[in-house]
Amino acid sequence: MDKRTLPSRLAAAGATLASLVAPSGAQAELKPGDTAPVFTAPAALGGKTFEFSLAKALGRGPVVVYFYPKAFTKGCTIEANRFAEAQDEYQALHATVIGVSGDDIDTLKKFSVEECRNRFAVASDADGSIMKAYGAVMPLLSSYAKRVSYVVGTDGRIAYAYSSLSPDEHVPNTLAALREMAKR
């Protein structure tokens, strides 16, 4: 191999890898102050299906919209259990919690009972439109959501955003954000 072509080949390989890691059309996550995209979606609570409406939920108070990759996987189960355990705290802050994933509604009916413990709803975003609108599509796996939590204020704007693959801090961080909002 000619030594002069090695740098250009490495540059081409790097560009190819970069295009795979950051697919075109990927959107950035929303930031505080951004308008939250309004959505309706099929959802499940306690094994029963209904149509969740962000606009209607915001009429009752702030909404925690949390995205998770896949029902019944280890991290997503841990996160759902933690949101379920904290529901009394969310309710005391007049907040609604809705989990969103690309899972089908039949899977979420079961997940809403077994892991969400009948305490909060989970919505199906099978076509990925909600994940895309919120910048929550997982790179390379577009049918999966990134683990991102948003607190949406009653004004329809993102009040808080937190992104971490770990499920550990989503509940405490969103509760802290809601407590700060309640002080205002």
Q: What role is predicted for each listed range?
A:
Residues 3-12:
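N-terminal export leaders
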Residues 37, 62, 146-148:
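Short loop/turn microsegments at loop-to-beta-strand junctions
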Residues 40-62:
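A short beta-strand-turn-helix
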Residues 54-81:
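Short active-site neighborhood of thiol/selenol oxidoreductases, capturing the structured segment around
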Residues 77-116, 128-130:
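Structural microenvironment flanking redox-active thiols in thiol-disulfide oxidoreductases
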Residues 118-120, 138-150:
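Structural micro-motif
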